[in-house]
Amino acid sequence: MTIGLVVSDVDGTLVDKKKQLTPGVIAAVERLRAVGLGFTIISARPRSGVMPLAETLAIDAPMGAFNGGIVFKRDGTVLCHHLIDRVVVEGVFALTEGAAVDTWVFADDKWYASNPDGAHVASERVASNQAPIVRQDFSDLYDRADKITFVSDDAALLAGLADRAKGFADRATIMQSQTYYLDVTALAANKGDGIAALSDAIGVPLDRTAAIGDQFNDVPMFARAGVSYAMGQGPEAVRAKATHVVAGNDADGVAEAIDAILAVR
C-alpha cells in the first residue's frame, strides 16, 4: 500500500503544547510535498483556528474544521457544512442545566462563551484565533450551532454528562477532543466521516490515507484510514487503536510519522 495523503489532527498532534508549529514539523510537511504526497488537517477547531496553520503550511487541499463538520479550502470555498440538529441542541442544554461546566457555542464563525475567565479560555483564544463573545443565553444560536463544548477539569463530571448524552448518539457526535472538553457536533461531524470526505474531495482512496492524532475523537479516522499513527503522549486506549505510535507532540511526532511514511514509499 502506497500512502497518497496524510491527514493530521491539530491540537496535541500537529502543534506543540504552546499551540505552535515547530520547524521540524514544517520541514517534514515540505519533504512530503516534495515527493508529490498530499497533506491536510482536520481539527475540532473552528475555521478561524485552522486558517493560520493552513497559511503557514500553504495547504491548498480541502481541510476539516469542527471534526469535519465543515470541509473547506483556504480560499474560503465551503465544500460541505453540517450543523447540529436543533433537537439535540435543546436536549444537551437541558441535561447540562445546573452542571458546573462552562459552555461554549461556535456558530456563524464566532465563539460564544459563558465565562470569559474560565480555565481554558486563554488556550482557546490561541486555538480558535479569536476572542469569545460573552453571554449566558444561547437560545438564538440553536438553529445554527456548529459545535457546543462543555468545559470542566472535573473528569468524572464530564464523563457523567457524556453518558447522559448517549441518548442523542443517533443524531449527533458527542466526544471528548481533550480530557477537559466535551464536544457536541453534527452526526456527520466526526473524524471518521471527515477523513472520508477529505479523501473524496482530494481524490485519494481511503486505503491510501494516513491519519495522525492523539485523542479519542481521532479514533474514528484511525479506523477508516489505511494506516494510523498515535502520538506518544496520548491516552493508552487511543494508542492501542493506532497502527503505530510515534513521539509526542513536543518531540515532533508528526515529523516522525511523515518520515516513516516516506521511508516505505
Q: What is each residue range found by the language model?
A:
Residues L57-I59, F66-N67, F168-D170, R224-A225, ...:
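Short, structured coil segments at secondary-structure junctions
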Residues G36-T40, D60-A61, K147, D207-T209, ...:
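Short active-site oxyanion
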Residues T2-K17:
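Asp-based phosphoryl-transfer active-site loop
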Residues G98-I212, F216-R224, Q233:
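Conserved acidic, metal-coordinating active-site core of Asp-based
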Residues L32, S43, N67, I148, ...:
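Residue-level signal for inorganic ion chemistry
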Residues K18-H120:
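Active-site phosphate-binding/coordination module
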Residues G24, G49-P52, G160, G194, ...:
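Phosphate- and divalent-cation-binding pockets in alpha/beta enzyme and binding domains
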Residues R224, S228-R265:
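Asp-based, Mg2+/Mn2+-dependent phosphohydrolase catalytic module
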